[in-house]
C-alpha cells in the first residue's frame, strides 16, 4: 500500500475500460464488404443454424457479423452496414448487420418491429 507522500507524487491510475466494439473505431455504424456468408451453430443448450457473415470494414478490420431476421439476400462482395451488438449464443460474434440498408434487403412479410428489420409498411 502506498504512503500519502507517494500518492501526492504519483496519484492513482484510472482503470481503462475495454471497448466492446473496437472495430467500429468509435462510430455508431461502419460500412463493409462481405467476404464470406455462412451458417454456424450456437452454444449449448441452443440448437439452430445461425446466419453470419465475415465482413471487411472500412476501418480495415475483418469481423464476424450476425444477419438478423428470417431469410436474406447477402452473398460475397455485398456492401453492408454493421452496428455493434453481440449475439449471446454465438462466441466471437459482436456485431450485427443492419437490414434494409445498402445491399441488404429488409425482411419480407414482417408485421411487428419493422424498423429493426428494414421492412416497409404494408399497403391497405
From Swiss-Prot:
Self-association and partners: Part of the 30S ribosomal subunit. Contacts proteins S8 and S17. May interact with IF1 in the 30S initiation complex.
Signal peptide region: none
Function: With S4 and S5 plays an important role in translational accuracy.
Protein name (Swiss-Prot/TrEMBL): Small ribosomal subunit protein uS12
Biased composition (Basic residues): 108-118
Family: Belongs to the universal ribosomal protein uS12 family.
Keyword Ribonucleoprotein: yes
The species this protein was found in: Mycobacterium tuberculosis (strain ATCC 25618 / H37Rv)
GO cellular component: ribosome; small ribosomal subunit
Keyword Transmembrane attributed: no
Origin organism lineage: Bacteria, Bacillati, Actinomycetota, Actinomycetes, Mycobacteriales
Molecular functions per Gene Ontology: rRNA binding; structural constituent of ribosome; tRNA binding
Gene that produces this protein: rpsL
CDD domains: Ribosomal_S12
